[in-house]
Structure formats: structure tokens, C-alpha cells
């Protein structure tokens, strides 16, 4: 049963105790905050803060948080009261670290007995209005969200000695963790480090019963509402807290297990602006799926560090691990393998469907892996992978194995994080000198897992641990069908639903406009007491399509006293629109501004703005206090490097240092450098230009730096890694001749080289030019194979058709490696079977087949059972390495036996018999 693999996942993620929340995916945002700055600096950056002779001008006196939580989200009202000791007018900054799943949906400023409400404006207009108000001596407040995850509120011309009250409304998704837990996190970086009065109250209103409520870091009382079937509860502080907040506050909610999607519905009325919104959350259980029943589609991409530092035992172990990995995949998968260093190469131009031909080519590629690619440049292959559209039918899972460190690590992590909804990343850090933050950061950014391999002795076992996690049951290619109930013009967010991996929770929002068609359907549903049914479908763990009905009960489940679901639905839709601008270069500004104004949301194109005419126009010089500049900033390319290995989940403090990569600038080196290295060098050399200080609010240096990096990546993506010049065209004839000669030399080999790739190999670039393209190095060619026919296309690195047939049973002779387990796996077919002709060379007896399998056409079934028995019996201590390959074989044998209409226990009986014979 999958409970055993679930326990592996719990071990990797640190278990499911209340103190392991730091391993949850949602906590990665806070983990990065902790790495980038000290606690002292971070706590000075939160709230309203200024420096005047190193003394606080604003001091937080009172802080209350009132929160309402439902099945999937929370709405919190933060009220903070500050005293103001300034003797002059002041321009201050209010800052709050804001999680990517959170959004400020309202804010108010109260001072001089006035309550001033923030309004959403288009960002440029808000900035213009703010500057005009300041210039005329009036008060103004403007709020934006920065790229580094902070909600920034600029308060201009605050009168001296006037106390200030800030009220902020924050809507957020709940954090999710293993075992279906829901977390509401208040990180300590959200609070100043000094003492203040703190009041904390939470109301829970769930649609399903709550199993347990716990709170880490704060003493609370929990009271369930009477007659609510434990669906509603109130959480309050046990006592008055006057010492502030010293630790993270994590509210841990454990709902009862519900293996079906659950919906919540919200209605906003008034005038013509009526609408419905829904929130659907789903935490499926796959506990009843046996490992050998899992036959789900997925794309596996492996990146192997082949830099010089990997030479010796590390690269040998990596090669052996890859030998095992490629035999662990099955015919529901796509696969590709990259080797990277100063340049990179890959076995296929695009990931190929896994079959005998693919396996043979990949196997030949793996045999030639060596530590011969110079330095460690991970960005170019990652751009090559992530710039390709993902296939929803084949969830993309990337495995990175490295022993080094890279330049501009943080920028790479930020880049891959943008693909968290399309790609899951697993990372392995080898040895004591690996950049631990790179390994952890890449995996956490894309909701994967990591493994620190301190010693290479058991490297294969540790590598396979994460591959097992990637094989766990999941639901992919998820779609919501609204047409079955007749509703139209429904806006779903996110529009593309991320695969639902084991122990993950899905949350989907929608906005249903109250047009005549929809209103008629909903009214009829209410009048007849017949809920509407929509359908969620997805590809299940066994390779079949699963369908889940979702009930929308507009009569009994309708909420009309909040806009919490609307707010998050609009926020998620804005994120979709912003992503479309980034990837597809669409102009969605008008739609984003419209949604921002309607629901009060700060976005890429909107800001909060408040201006107020002062009773007494400020004539004194305004003092600007910018808490952003009270400490040396962390450089965008700064390094926080972790030394030493350790098991996954280690959370010890990591040493910080600023590191830079030394690069040769000699002409000879530049000439020899590959184009992928040129791309990386151009990328890494980017730095934000210094800006003149202005009173007006302006975009940060980080914005400029990110834009340059994005432009650099776009240069590669738009040209597909191939930027030709007139000089290149002059050499086309030579390249054609080279390609023809290569075709003749290879004959019917299993692997050609794309003509474009050959052209690239022929071209000689002027080393003085800046080249932004990424070109894979020439791929090592495997030996000829008579079992694979000559391809009919110009590129043998392009994907094979899905229907590509497996190679014939006759297999070539395989030279022994001296490692019997590897020898056996290397002659396994892609479907998991072995043939008599392949194992005869290993002198494994296959006679004494049971009567049911004694005919020649059934030989392969018995042969496969014999090999399974031999591996299980003689390599029991290496089970972690061969487990997936044997599961594939077991599945194939059981399928063949079922076709023969043999009893279900036949496999176990035959396997027991085979063990006695080997």
C-alpha cells in the first residue's frame, strides 16, 4: 500500500509534528526572508519606523489582529497604533512582509481625529497624485507591493507629534502541509522586536468538522461553538500580552479527512454589480493505491553536474544512479537528460516518450557521462527547459544533481519559482562544499524536495528516495467542467490547474457573473432545492480518467456577509493575467486595473492612494525617513552559501558570505567558451544602474535588474537558442557536407544529430561579440544498434511519435560492467520485461517453467519472473535502488497473467517457485 511511500514523504519533509511547519511549501517565502536579512534588520523594516539620531520616531503601542478563517482562506484586520515623537513633518514608510498568496484588500489611516480610506488607482496616476499632494504641502499616502514581497505604504507630510493608527485588511490562502493540515502563519518578521500590547482573536467557520486545533508560539484558548458539529470555533489569547511577539505564531487546523471536493459559495449584491464566487478545495487520498498499480503519465528531466569538481567517485556514482533511474521509468513517461557545466548537452532535443528505442539511446548517453564540462552554469539548461511549454498530460518533474555553487543563485531561484505551477523540482546536493541554499532554494521554489548527499557511498539509495516521491500517486491534467450545469462566462482562477501531487491540497476559485442566463439557472436551483453539479476530471494514478462531482448548493451554502472569496478569486485571476503578460506578452493592463479597482487590490498596475488637504499647509521642510536605507542592503547577487551536507529538512543556520565567480578574460579563453557560457556570462554581468535620489517615489534598482535579466532570458527564448548572422550563412555549404558525411558514418544508428545542431558546431563565432544564445554541445553518439531503424526526419534528437513501436525482442549483447544488478537492469526492456535471449548471456537458467508458461510464446513471462526472483533474493540490501524497476516488471507480468485468465494469486505462486530455483 502507499502508506509506506507516504511515510517516506513524511520522513523527507520532517514528519507531521506541529513544529515541522518550516518544511511546508508555504513557509519558503519566510525562509528566504530569514536568509536574506538578520532578524534585527527585518524587524526594523516592519510596520511604521524611522530613525532620528538612532531613536525611534514612531513607536508601536497597540496591535490587534482579528481574523476569520474558512476551509481554504483567511481575512484579517490588522490595527496598529503608533505614537509620533517627531518635531518636524515627516515622510515615513510602513512596510509589511506579504506572502505571495496574500493580498491587501483595504487600508485606512487615522490621525488628527480623521479616518482616511485608501482608494485603488492606476499606478502611474497614483504616483502623480501623491507627488502633487506632497508638493502642495498636503498629506498623502500611497501603497504598493514590491517584487521582494513587501507591502509598502508611503506616508507623506505627517504632522509632528500626531499619533497614527494604521488599519490593514489582508486576505490570504491558508498554508497547507502534510496530512491535510491547514496553517495560518504570523511570522515574527511581521512585528517589531520591542514590547507592545498585542491582542489576537480568530473565528473559524468551516463547512466540515474540525478534528483538532493547535497553536505553536502563542498561548490561546479554543472554544467550539455549541451545536456547530465542531465546524465553528473561536480562538482567543489566554492572557494579556504586553511583551510583543517573540516567536512565529502558527495556528494549526486539522479538518476531518474528506476525499471529495468541497465548495463554498459567496454572493455580493447591490445595484447592477451582482456576482457569485466559489472556492473549491480538494485533498484526495491515494492510500488504497498499490505501488505496482501506479501507471500515471509524467515527464522526467534529469540535469547532471558534469563540471570538473564532479570527477572521480562523484561522477561514477552519478552515472550508476542514472543507469538505475532510466530503467525505473515506464512507458507512461517522457524523459530527457542534460549534462551541464560551462556548457550543456542533452540526449534529446525535446523529451521523448519512453520506449525501447528511447531507453537504448538514453542508456548510451548515460554511459558516456563524465566530468568534462568545466564550470557550473545551471541557468542556460534551466532556461532551455522552462522556456518549453509544459504538457498538462505529462506533469514536468525536474531532477538536479550538483556538487557546486553558481553565480547569481538568488536570481536563478526567482526565475524558476515563476514556473512553480508547471514544474516540480527535486535537488541533490553532493559533498561538503555544495551551495546548500541553492539545493534547498530550487526545490522549495517549485514545491519539490531535496536531499543532501554527504558521502557518495549510499548515493544511489538517496537519489532513488526522491524518485520514489515523484512516483507517488497524483491527479494531473485537472479540469473543471462548468457546461454541465449551464453556467456561462465563468472566470476560473487559476485558469490552468497545477497537478495535485500526493499530500497536496488543491484550491480553485471562480467568479460567476450575474447575467440573465446564470441568474435564471441559479434561481431555479434555489426554488427547486436542487443543487447544481459541476464536474472535476483528472488523470488518476492508475492511468485512467477520474471524475468527481462537485455540488453547488446556492440555497443552503450561500454566504452573503463577506467578500472574502470574491477578493481571492479576483487576486488569483490578476495573477493569471500578469503571468499572461510575462509569458505571452499580452496587454492585460485594463483588465487588471478594473479588477484592482473593483476589489481594492494592489497589483503590478494598481496602487492605493490617499490624499488629504491639511488644515495647516506644511511650510517646514519635510523630513524623509526611509527604513529601506537604514542598513546595508543585501546585494541582488549576494551569496548566502551553506557548507556541509546533511539530511533533508535540516534547518540549522547557514553561514553568509559574498562570493563571486572568477572568470577568465583572456582572448583565447573567450574564443573557446561555448555559446551557453556566453549567455550565462551576459546574464551574470548584469547589474542595476545607480539612480539619483529623488523625493518622488521611484522604482527600485531591483526592478531594473530583474527587467534586464528578463530581457536576457527573452533573447534566448525568442530566438530558440539560435541567432544566425550573415557570417554564419557563408558556411552553410560546409555544414551541409558535414551533415551528409555524418549521416553516412552513422548509417542506421539510433541517434542522429539535428542539422541545426551540426550547423552550430560548424560555425565559428567572433569572441568579441556578446552572444546571448544557448547552444547544447555536441551530444556523444551511442554505438550502432541493429534493433532501431534509421529515422526519417532530419533530427534524430526530436521526440519520437507517441505511437513509436518498441524495438524487437532480440537485444544486442551487453558487455558486463562487473556489477550484476546493473547488468540485469541494462537488458530490461522499457515495459519491464526480460527476454530469454538477453539473459542467456548472463547464464541464468530459465528452464523448469510452470506448465501454464511452458510454451515458447510465453517464455518471456517466465524469464521475467526468474529475473525478479534473482534480484529480490540476491540484492535485498539494495532494494531501494531496484524497487521501481521491479514494480514495473511485476505490473507487466501480472498484466500478462491476467490475459491468460489465471487466478490473482498466480504471480505470488510463480515468484515463490522461481526463488527456489535461482
Swiss-Prot record:
InterPro entries: VIT, VWF_A, vWFA_dom_sf. SMART domains: VIT, VWA. Residues 752-774 have a biased composition (Basic and acidic residues). Residues 650-690, 777-814 have a biased composition (Low complexity). Residues 625-814 are annotated as: Disordered. Residues 716-746 have a biased composition (Acidic residues). It holds the Pfam family VIT. This is von Willebrand factor A domain-containing protein DDB_G0292016. It comes from Dictyostelium discoideum.
